[in-house]
């Protein structure tokens, strides 16, 4: 991967999208993770620090280290940022785990968090004539590891064509802090949650499988080449198929 060439391509993409929309810049959610850190870094490179706004959106169960890392990144880049705690919004919905009478529901309550955050980002976007820069990567998009009208809701997905392992490589090249690059990836949807635990496979291995699928290799060959059980390959293929709707336009009858 040619990091210099890729950086130029992505910065030009940001400039193009912002220019087409006659926007003043971009706003993005800063989670303290590698994806949002890389997107913020590239946007600053493209637009300058004064045209990038970061929004940190923790809630009462968020890992405090994530907020620290988000602020570390914002300060390193010199961008303005605001902190918008979503705990009270979750309570107003009656979300499980936020009021005493309800248990946390991973599907309903877990997905509510990124949807609230999307609304906040678009508020700041509309208020300041900014575009919302999405932070989902190619591995997540393939696996449907994102919330429809939540973190997948944005004006563009800058790293949507980069696998997670490529995100790591480019982040190192562009100077994203090591403590952000090296920590376990997590969507932060519930306490102790990590991407790889939930996906049941490391990103390093998953990306190799996804690249092989892109090359139209047979599942038996992928299993043999990567020493991955055929059942796991089938599980990944099924997950890709069942989550395609998250990346497709809303269905309209003919």
Swiss-Prot record:
The keyword NAD applies. Coiled coil: none annotated. InterPro entries: NAD/GMP_synthase (IPR022310), NAD_synthase (IPR003694), NH(3)-dep_NAD(+)_synth (IPR022926), Rossmann-like_a/b/a_fold (IPR014729). It is an enzyme of class 6 (ligase). One of its GO terms (biological process) is NAD biosynthetic process. Gene3D superfamilies: HUPs. Keywords: ATP-binding, Ligase, Magnesium, Metal-binding, NAD, Nucleotide-binding. It comes from the Archaea. GO terms for cellular component: cytoplasm. It catalyses: deamido-NAD(+) + NH4(+) + ATP = AMP + diphosphate + NAD(+) + H(+). Deamido-NAD(+) binds at residues 115, 148, 155, 245-246. Its EC number is 6.3.1.5. Catalyzes the ATP-dependent amidation of deamido-NAD to form NAD. Uses ammonia as a nitrogen source. This is NH(3)-dependent NAD(+) synthetase. The gene is nadE.
